[in-house]
UniProtKB/Swiss-Prot annotation:
HAMAP family: Thymidy_synth_bact. Keywords: Cytoplasm, Methyltransferase, Nucleotide biosynthesis, Transferase. This is Thymidylate synthase. DUMP binds at R21, R126, R127, R166, S167, A168, D169, N177, H207, I208, Y209. SUPFAM superfamilies: Thymidylate synthase/dCMP hydroxymethylase (SSF55831). One of its GO terms (biological process) is methylation. Belongs to the thymidylate synthase family. Bacterial-type ThyA subfamily. It is found in: Cytoplasm.
Length: 264
């Protein structure tokens, strides 16, 4: 994906070296945008192999409103283990905010259900937004949300999604985020009777950790390959009814995986 490789190249060329919360050190730029037209293929990185199983199960976990790693671990996914407490809980992170945003009167807002309803019945609304950045709840999250909020846009029978990501680990995290939100867009388009349009990924602090520089250079040396296609079970009409078996990535021919250590 040229958009992603251009981002890597920009950060290597223009990035400023900065300290960070983890003590690892980064080079970063502030403000970057990538656009992916899903008509051109599913944006799953080809210059290194991604673990699609983790991406799908994590998204289903978010949509369940779950915040305990047991569901992920039961399906062989370990990407959240480092931030979980001794009971496996992560606090009021993504799934909680997406499905159970607390209100002042003691109630809860299911933002995903409201987004589906708005897309179907008020598609011209400029308020079709789902936010995980709940300022009053940040102290109850083991890790504040990096991909903070996203907005839907309906035009000419197509549904598009724009994500704002405040903190973007470009080598490890961003490829997962691209694939995850592109998949969410396809799922939301299907259940609302629309075609999937563009996924727009807007980044705030876009950084490469200093211990990932050699991996990034290796990735930039590889020639991108044609994008795969994501096939989704057409019989699923409710956003909360999707199962892992409803997804099939076809014609995915990536370069080999490149390992990198997660900064915790």
């Amino acid at each position: 994906m040229k958009q992603y490789l251009d981002l890597l190249d920009r950060v290597l060329t223009e990035g400023i070296e900065k300290g960070d919360r983890t003590g690892t050190g980064t080079i970063s730029v502030f403000g970057h945008q990538m656009r992916f037209n899903l008509d051109e293929g599913f944006p799953c990185l080809t210059t290194k192999k991604l673990h699609l199983k983790s991406i799908i199960y994590e998204l289903l976990w978010f949509l369940k409103g779950d915040t305990n790693v047991k569901y992920l671990q039961d399906h062989g996914v370990r990407i959240w283990n480092e931030w979980a407490d001794e009971t496996g809980d992560l606090g009021h992170i993504y799934g909680y905010q997406w499905r159970s945003w607390p209100t002042y009167d003691g109630g809860f807002i299911d933002q995903i259900s409201e987004a589906v309803d708005a897309i179907k019945h008020n598609p011209d609304s400029r308020r079709i937004i789902v936010s995980a950045w709940n300022v009053g709840d940040l102290d109850h999250m083991n890790l504040p949300p990096c991909h903070a909020f996203f907005q839907f846009y309906v035009a000419n029978g197509r549904l598009s999604l724009q994500l704002y990501q405040r903190s973007a680990d470009i080598f490890l995290g961003v490829p997962f985020n691209i694939a995850s939100y592109a998949l969410l867009l396809q799922m939301m388009a299907q259940v609302t009777g629309l075609q999937a349009g563009d996924f727009i990924h807007t980044l705030g602090d876009a950084h490469i950790y200093l211990n990932h520089l050699e991996q990034v250079k290796l990735q930039l040396s590889r020639e991108p390959r044609p994008l795969p296609q994501m096939k989704i079970n057409p019989d699923v009409k409710n956003i909360f009814d999707f199962q892992f078996e409803d997804f099939e990535l076809v014609n995915y021919d990536p370069h080999p995986h490149i390992a990198g250590k997660v900064a915790v």
